Structure formats: structure tokens, C-alpha cells
């Protein structure tokens, strides 16, 4: 944290060759007001300092006009994307800046999961040619076991953002594989299910999984 006790303000330090910090909150937890910043040459700084303000958080409220309608997010991005983004933003009890770009990024991840299993060029919904009933090779098995262990541990510790990050790594790895074992995909969907239940359930069914993936 940047040490700004003299001004009663804290933020995350950014080392980019000069003095810069992301000023988010005052020490008492209240928002940083506009009169505590100043404009210089197109940039915003903490008044009287060389600390550059790269982001400033405001609580959502109707009076500020910055309320996000969850129904609109679900309509445009899907319920899984909204759920996953809220979990990916960090500790649930922490105050976090809302970003629609972030929601879009999470939706892109879910789309990659879909393309990892489904043939996106087919006229109907069918498994892609890479899905096989062969066993995992050594690298695939290691990646699968590491992912199961990491996601399980992080989920139990409620470190949801790092669990999601590990699932992203899994998806990137297996997307590059010419063969994607069906059982590895099903194991991954079990991990994904608490985070993106609708997508996980649909893909589980398409892979021939028995019953409900959440059970």
C-alpha cells in the first residue's frame, strides 16, 4: 500500500518509473472526493502531491447515477458471466470497482470453454472433433490433477478469483491440445459448476454425463 497517512488516504502502489498510486479510498473508508484531486496536463493527481490517480471508486447509488442493473447484465452477458465476474473480482467482503469490460472478459472465458468442447462451425450443437475417449497423456494428466487440487483448495478457502484463474489456465492449455479427453473435460465441468452452473450443466449433458453435474 502506498503510505499516504499524512493525508489519510490509501491506495495500491503502481511502480511505473515515477511516483504513482491508484488512490481508491480515504483511511476511514469513505470515497475520495473531487476536491482532493487536481488536474495537471490531462492527468489527475492527489492534490499537492505527485501521486497520480489512476482509478477512483464511488459507491453505487441512484443519486450518482452509477447503479448497474443486474437484469441488463444478465440479458447482455448471461447469468453465468455475472456470477463469475462477481466471484473473480476478489474477496467477497472487499470493496471493488465495477467494470463492464471485466464482465465482457469473463464472458469471453466462458465462450472459450464452450469452444473447447463444442464445434463452433457446425450448423448444430455437436462436440468438436478434438473430443476423444482416449486417456490423458502425461502433460494433460498433470495439468488436470494440478487444476483439481488448486481449484478445490481455493474454493474451500473462498479464494474464488484464484480458482477461476486456474480454470482459465486449464482452458488455455487444453484448447491447444489436438485431443481433449472426454473424462478430463467432465472433471473440469465439475470444478466449473459452482461458478458457471448453467454452462457447466449444458456441456455436461452434451458430453454424455450422467445425472446432474452439480451432484
What are these regions (language model features)?
Residues 2-7, 45-79, 93-104:
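Conserved phosphate-binding loops in nucleotide/dinucleotide-binding enzymes
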Residues 1-59:
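Glycine-rich (often Gly-Gly/Gly-Pro-rich) flexible segments and glycine-rich loop motifs
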Residues 71-215:
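Helix-rich, typically C-terminal accessory recognition domains appended to large enzymatic cores
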